UniProtKB/Swiss-Prot annotation:
Gene from which this protein is expressed: snx3
InterPro entries noted in UniProt: PX_dom (IPR001683), PX_dom_sf (IPR036871), PX_Grd19_PX (IPR042138), Sorting_Nexin (IPR051074)
Taxonomic path: Eukaryota, Fungi, Dikarya, Ascomycota, Taphrinomycotina
Cited PROSITE patterns: PX (PS50195)
Biological process according to GO: endocytic recycling; intracellular protein transport; late endosome to Golgi transport
Protein name in the entry: Sorting nexin-3
């Protein structure tokens, strides 16, 4: 009978166990707010980003985005990331889109989308639009 070899176990120091991880990127989509009246109503979502990664200008940021800006961001990511499959956004909603449960479902979908794309190593290091979308108060999509 052959003995299976076990990998070597390295002991960690207390400093290593409690030190700040090398790369942190935390993204939350919170606090949806509906604006406007009648046909001009829309909802914005607050994107809170906490990171220590060098590709981001700020360590802590908070910006507001509408769904249409997420769509433009998605399109820009697809154009610049030919080798990476960009996950879909939550679907467009045509009826009852301002109900609390519908807004919450979309918020969760947008948060999952951002966490997926921002967690991809190639997008983190090579995207020209990721940090701008997550951190710039005036996100200006290119046509």
């Amino acid at each position: 009978m052959d003995k299976l070899s076990r990998p070597e176990i390295r002991q960690q120091t207390t400093q290593q166990m409690y030190d700040v991880p090398e790369n942190i990127l935390e993204i939350d989509v919170i606090n949806p707010q509906t604006h406007g009246i009648g046909r001009n109503m829309f909802t914005t979502y607050e994107i809170v980003c906490r990171t220590n990664m060098p590709y981001f200008r700020l360590h802590n940021s908070s910006v507001r985005r509408r769904y249409s800006e997420f769509e433009k961001f998605h399109d820009m990511l697809e154009r610049e990331s030919g080798r990476v499959s960009i996950p879909p956004l939550p679907g467009k909603i045509f009826t009852q889109r301002f109900r609390d449960d519908v807004i919450e479902e979309r918020r969760q979908g947008l948060e999952n989308f951002l966490r997926l794309v921002a967690g991809h190593p190639l997008i983190q290091t090579h995207s020209r639009v990721l940090s701008s979308f997550l951190q710039s108060p005036e996100f200006k999509p290119t046509p």
